[in-house]
Curated annotation (Swiss-Prot):
It comes from Homo sapiens (Human). This is Golgi membrane protein 1. The lineage of its organism: Eukaryota, Metazoa, Chordata, Craniata, Vertebrata. The gene is GOLM1. Residues 244-255, 264-285, 381-395 have a biased composition (Basic and acidic residues). Residues 1-12 are cytoplasmic. The modification N-acetylmethionine is found at residue 1. Residues 350-360 have a biased composition (Acidic residues).
Amino acid sequence: MMGLGNGRRSMKSPPLVLAALVACIIVLGFNYWIASSRSVDLQTRIMELEGRVRRAAAERGAVELKKNEFQGELEKQREQLDKIQSSHNFQLESVNKLYQDEKAVLVNNITTGERLIRVLQDQLKTLQRNYGRLQQDVLQFQKNQTNLERKFSYDLSQCINQMKEVKEQCEERIEEVTKKGNEAVASRDLSENNDQRQQLQALSEPQPRLQAAGLPHTEVPQGKGNVLGNSKSQTPAPSSEVVLDSKRQVEKEETNEIQVVNEEPQRDRLPQEPGREQVVEDRPVGGRGFGGAGELGQTPQVQAALSVSQENPEMEGPERDQLVIPDGQEEEQEAAGEGRNQQKLRGEDDYNMDENEAESETDKQAALAGNDRNIDVFNVEDQKRDTINLLDQREKRNHTL
């Protein structure tokens, strides 16, 4: 039974085997198809790769050619670079030499410049010191100028006061002289009247004798009348002349006293020339007719003026002692003072050479004001000259620096 069953099964198995075989054949065919398709693809790829290799070889040959060309060019460029580098090195060496030379020159210039700077610094310090001294001198000069201006104003006020006093004294003397002249005229009139009376008495005594001799009586009184008329007509004339002479004399004395008062401060300030003093002393003082009396009357007033002028320097001594002037400025101020004194003396000589006419107070004050202005102008000019000289010196020093 068992055998029969297995036989049956073996009778049924071939179709399955066939199916399996067909399936295997199909699978194998599919695999073959796949493999053949892959091989075709691979062949195509191989062909492509071969083409690429050929192309790469061709390109490689071209690249090698280009490489050779580039190497030649590189060698040429290297040679050029070597040449350029050698020329550059030569230029650098030359530039370095020039730089070193210039550096040495600049170092020398710097050293000389430093020396000059030190010298200029020393000069600047000295100039600053000199400038400070000059400023001190300028301040001292200004102080001295202010002191001199104060002193000059004080002298002017004293001169004006002295002139007023002298004028008052002159007016008093004019009044005294006029009174004396009137008294002298009156005394002369009295003496002449007494003389005439004595003559009339002397003539009246021999009158009877003349009548006895038969001389006319009317002639004598006519002569007496003429004499009296002449004496009366002549008596007023001397009085007017005396008054005029006295006025002229007083005016001359006033002018001479003013000259003496003006000369005294100048003598105190600067010594005059000996010839100038002799001219002042030799000038005539008296007037007409009353020369001796004029000189005698003038001496006490001149002495009073001299005493006042001598007292004034004693009062002004401390102020003068306070004025401290350097040596250079003393010489400049002495030169300026000598020029001013010469101009003043010339003005006084011109004033004395003119006719001795009476001047009013306004004229005198105007003359004094003119002198003050002239002196102020001289002071301003001196200051301008000093400043100009200082500026010129500074400019010269700046140019030298």
